[in-house]
Amino acid sequence: MATDSTQCVKKSRGRPKVFDRDAALDKAMKLFWQHGYEATSLADLVEATGAKAPTLYAEFTNKEGLFRAVLDRYIDRFAAKHEAQLFCEEKSVESALADYFAAIANCFTSKDTPAGCFMINNCTTLSPDSGDIANTLKSRHAMQERTLQQFLCQRQARGEIPPHCDVTHLAEFLNCIIQGMSISAREGASLEKLMQIAGTTLRLWPELVK
């Protein structure tokens, strides 16, 4: 029995390490978030994820494919949760926006991730010839703005926003506030500072919807 047990241990030690896709994406996310797409090399990704280059290629095809998978992971882990704050029927429009901004401010200043917004950080570091990656990020930004517009349209239909208010322009304005919060966080702004920005925006709400 002892011999059989020893053989089992030896066999288990010899098994190849299983590739953990989610863990690899989270590690790659931190690199792209901190340094940007173009400044992050495949060698950096191999070192951070602990996976061999052929494994990453087999799973994601190339660096661009890995980035797209990371972007999807970011949206699932962070952006979608922020946007969920908007669509709680029990909240007033101001309360929903306050919770949305608070979730974003906490994310942008979290000690667990690099400062700022993953998407905005990457956009600001791309070169003019970045091509498909730039288009992918631009498309996602447009989705964020459309989500805000959808939220505002719903609240307008409920009578919380006057019918004459242009919710398209209002969504653009709110999206610009978020971009400014990201840049401020990247420059070292604290959670309290970002909450002040959000608070000022909400205090202006009656004027914004006139």
Swiss-Prot record:
<dbReference type="GO" id="GO:0003700">
    <property type="term" value="F:DNA-binding transcription factor activity"/>
</dbReference>
<feature type="domain" description="HTH tetR-type">
    <location>
        <begin position="18"/>
        <end position="78"/>
    </location>
</feature>
<keyword id="KW-0678">Repressor</keyword>
<keyword id="KW-0805">Transcription regulation</keyword>
<protein>
    <recommendedName>
        <fullName>HTH-type transcriptional repressor ComR</fullName>
    </recommendedName>
</protein>
<dbReference type="InterPro" id="IPR009057">
    <property type="entry name" value="Homeodomain-like_sf"/>
</dbReference>
<dbReference type="InterPro" id="IPR011075">
    <property type="entry name" value="TetR_C"/>
</dbReference>
<keyword id="KW-0804">Transcription</keyword>
<comment type="function">
    <text>Represses expression of BhsA/ComC by binding to its promoter region in the absence of copper.</text>
</comment>
<feature type="DNA-binding region" description="H-T-H motif">
    <location>
        <begin position="41"/>
        <end position="60"/>
    </location>
</feature>
<dbReference type="GO" id="GO:0006355">
    <property type="term" value="P:regulation of DNA-templated transcription"/>
</dbReference>
<dbReference type="Pfam" id="PF16925">
    <property type="entry name" value="TetR_C_13"/>
</dbReference>
<dbReference type="InterPro" id="IPR036271">
    <property type="entry name" value="Tet_transcr_reg_TetR-rel_C_sf"/>
</dbReference>
<dbReference type="InterPro" id="IPR001647">
    <property type="entry name" value="HTH_TetR"/>
</dbReference>
<keyword id="KW-0186">Copper</keyword>
<dbReference type="GO" id="GO:0003677">
    <property type="term" value="F:DNA binding"/>
</dbReference>
<dbReference type="GO" id="GO:0046688">
    <property type="term" value="P:response to copper ion"/>
</dbReference>
<keyword id="KW-0238">DNA-binding</keyword>
<dbReference type="Pfam" id="PF00440">
    <property type="entry name" value="TetR_N"/>
</dbReference>
<dbReference type="GO" id="GO:0000976">
    <property type="term" value="F:transcription cis-regulatory region binding"/>
</dbReference>
<dbReference type="GO" id="GO:0045892">
    <property type="term" value="P:negative regulation of DNA-templated transcription"/>
</dbReference>
